[in-house]
């Protein structure tokens, strides 16, 4: 059988901006037979995420993520349906997910590398397992629980940067659900600001491309900032940190403004901002969700429950077709998405 796949065509360079042409689609032969322990799956949805930017470099700069190789199939979060199985615990028709799903229309995988998912947890919206009821949702929930130090009724103010993205849009809502009295989002368009306040329950939203961020922050956070969910780093974060209270907390989720630069992760703060951090005893610890695997299952159940109760609103931007993986990645890296950026490869969920 002939199937399509996407491979890494070229590297943008550590300081370059990724473009759709860094990826290319090609055809490849899929064997007709599968071995014991293997399954053949049809890909339904694929995820593009900011962390993937470092996988485009020859060296990712981390010990837990490997680089993609030139002319080799690219991989990431994916979900699909089993068409044929020789694995004892997986049967035809099961829905499965993996963090290392090849960007390919159909693929033969080791059944042990896959996790079965229950469509009822997402009311049939399978792509949500790649977003709010998946790794981005867990990153937001566990990050806030472990590093935010929020308790019900503690009257805290939380600021979220990259607030209309996959993690940010969920993090702000979770802030309220766990007890923050005020949640303020920072994003890059008027449309995103309106969405945050009218649909996702944010108390205020700041457009960093148009507004004076420092001024707007002072206005929308009169009691200062107690918790900062940082998705972007750079100048925006410097502005937020300078308005943070004593003994406040930064949740380091990502630094997308720094991903196209050859700097360590997390990037060091400027001397002036670092002085503020130390003086006010602000915690800024690297957070890696993969270190909290024991909290994944209860976390997914909690996120699913909030979603079903209507307390967690889920937003996603969907592009169709494997041939658009590169365009979807480029768009996500430049803020073209609202909520989770998803690529739909096949919508047919029956066999």
UniProtKB/Swiss-Prot annotation:
Its EC number is 1.3.1.48. Disulfide bonds: none annotated. The keyword rRNA-binding does not apply. It is an enzyme of class 1 (oxidoreductase). GO terms for molecular function: 15-oxoprostaglandin 13-oxidase [NAD(P)+] activity. Keywords: Cytoplasm, Lipid metabolism, NADP, Oxidoreductase. Pfam families: ADH_N_2, ADH_zinc_N. One of its GO terms (biological process) is prostaglandin metabolic process. It catalyses: 13,14-dihydro-15-oxo-prostaglandin E2 + NAD(+) = 15-oxoprostaglandin E2 + NADH + H(+); 13,14-dihydro-15-oxo-prostaglandin E2 + NADP(+) = 15-oxoprostaglandin E2 + NADPH + H(+); 13,14-dihydro-15-oxo-PGF2alpha + NADP(+) = 15-oxoprostaglandin F2alpha + NADPH + H(+); 13,14-dihydro-15-oxo-prostaglandin E1 + NADP(+) = 15-oxoprostaglandin E1 + NADPH + H(+). Gene3D superfamilies: Medium-chain alcohol dehydrogenases, catalytic domain, NAD(P)-binding Rossmann-like Domain. It is found in: Cytoplasm. InterPro entries: ADH-like_C, ADH_N_2, GroES-like_sf, MDR_fam, NAD(P)-bd_dom_sf, PTGR2. NADP(+) binds at residues 165-168, 192, 208, 231, 253-259, 287-289, 337. SUPFAM superfamilies: GroES-like, NAD(P)-binding Rossmann-fold domains. It comes from the Eukaryota. Belongs to the NADP-dependent oxidoreductase L4BD family. Monomer. This is Prostaglandin reductase 2.
């Amino acid at each position: 059988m002939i199937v399509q796949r996407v491979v890494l065509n070229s590297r943008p360079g550590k300081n370059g901006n990724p473009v759709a042409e860094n990826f290319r689609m090609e055809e490849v032969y899929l064997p007709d037979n599968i071995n014991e322990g293997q399954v053949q799956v049809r890909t339904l949805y694929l995820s593009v995420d900011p962390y993937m930017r470092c996988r485009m470099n020859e060296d990712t700069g981390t010990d837990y993520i490997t680089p993609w190789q030139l002319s080799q199939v690219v991989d990431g979060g994916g979900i699909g349906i089993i068409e044929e199985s020789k694995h004892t615990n997986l049967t035809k028709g099961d829905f499965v997910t993996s963090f290392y799903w090849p960007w390919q229309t159909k693929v033969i995988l080791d059944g042990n590398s896959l996790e079965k998912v229950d469509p009822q947890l997402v009311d049939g919206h399978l792509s949500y397992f790649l977003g709010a009821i998946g790794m981005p949702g867990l990153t937001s929930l566990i990050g806030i629980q472990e590093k935010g130090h929020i308790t019900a009724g503690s009257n805290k103010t939380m600021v979220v940067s990259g607030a209309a993205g996959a993690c940010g849009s969920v993090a702000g809502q979770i802030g309220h659900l766990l007890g923050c009295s005020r949640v303020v989002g920072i994003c890059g368009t008027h449309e995103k600001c309106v969405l945050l306040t009218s649909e996702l329950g944010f108390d205020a939203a700041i457009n960093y491309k148009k507004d004076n961020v420092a001024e707007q922050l002072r206005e929308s956070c009169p009691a200062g900032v107690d918790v900062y969910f940082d998705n972007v780093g750079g100048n925006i974060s410097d502005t937020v940190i300078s308005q943070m209270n004593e003994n406040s907390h930064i949740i380091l989720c990502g630094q997308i403004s720094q991903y196209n630069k050859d700097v360590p992760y997390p990037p060091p703060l400027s001397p002036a901002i670092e002085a503020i951090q130390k003086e006010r005893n602000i915690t800024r610890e690297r957070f890696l969700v993969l270190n909290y695997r024991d909290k994944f299952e209860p976390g997914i159940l909690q996120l699913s429950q909030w979603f079903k109760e209507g307390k967690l609103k889920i937003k996603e931007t969907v592009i169709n077709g494997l041939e658009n993986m590169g365009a979807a990645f480029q768009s996500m890296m430049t803020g073209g998405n609202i909520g989770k950026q998803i690529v739909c490869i096949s919508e047919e969920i029956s066999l």
